[in-house]
Amino acid sequence: MKVLVIGASGMAGSAIVKSALAAGDQVTANGRSQEKLADLQKSFPEIDILAKDAFALTKEELLNFDVVVDAFSAPTKSYLQIDLAAHLVHLVREEQSPRLAFVLGAGSLHTGSDQHLVVDDLAKAPNAESWIEIPESQLYELEYLRHVKNVSWFGLSPSQEFVAGDADPEPLVGQETLLVNAEGKSFTTSGTLANALVAEYHHPEHLNQRFTVANH
């Protein structure tokens, strides 16, 4: 499959590039920094690179791909995650392809006996005001996507902690609830998330839905 990875040089994006190549996909890595993409290409010489602001991507460019992965991150301007999702959706409205894949956050998952949102717990953490907009924006991004009916998309949320690391060969998989392993830990490695995302677009199970994975 022909796959475009937006935000390819980041932790999630680079792991997705690796997993997609392992699955036999033809991968194009997108980002604004030519230097970062060139470094990524040193690790994965078989990729193509497209150094360009994601907001400048055109419909014609997206239609060249079977899958477009949004692994974009903008910690200081997290609202851009919502804007980019809307931009990508706008470009492929009423098209059968590409399928849009969004890396979301854990804040939109539910937890506890009352099934409250994880973001509500995060908001109570010390100094949360300095970073809470990030999980809030990821929640709003998912809420927006849930109203999108004429575009093929799916979202994938990691668990409470999202860390760099290899894939778990036997990950936990869920839908709307925060996953916790047998040791009481809730974390997802970048490799686990990447493998789950690539598996989903090769073997679709979550059509216009979000799901979640965690290391067991």
Language-model-derived ranges and their functions:
Residues 3-23:
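N-terminal Rossmann NAD(P)H-binding glycine-rich loop of SDR-like oxidoreductase domains
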Residues 25-32:
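Conserved glycine-rich Rossmann-like NAD(P)H-binding loop of the short-chain dehydrogenase/reductase
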Residues 36, 41-97, 205:
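NAD(P)H-binding glycine-rich loop region in Rossmannoid oxidoreductase-like domains
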Residues 77, 107-112, 161-165:
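Conserved catalytic-site region of short-chain dehydrogenase/reductase
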Residues 87-133:
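Conserved Rossmann-fold NAD(P)-dependent oxidoreductase catalytic core, especially the SDR/UDP-sugar
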Residues 114, 148-149, 163-170, 200-209:
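Glycine/proline-rich active-site loop of Rossmann-fold NAD(P)-dependent oxidoreductases
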Residues 137, 184-198, 209:
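Substrate-positioning beta->alpha
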Residues 143-163:
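Conserved beta-loop-beta element that borders a ligand/cofactor-binding pocket
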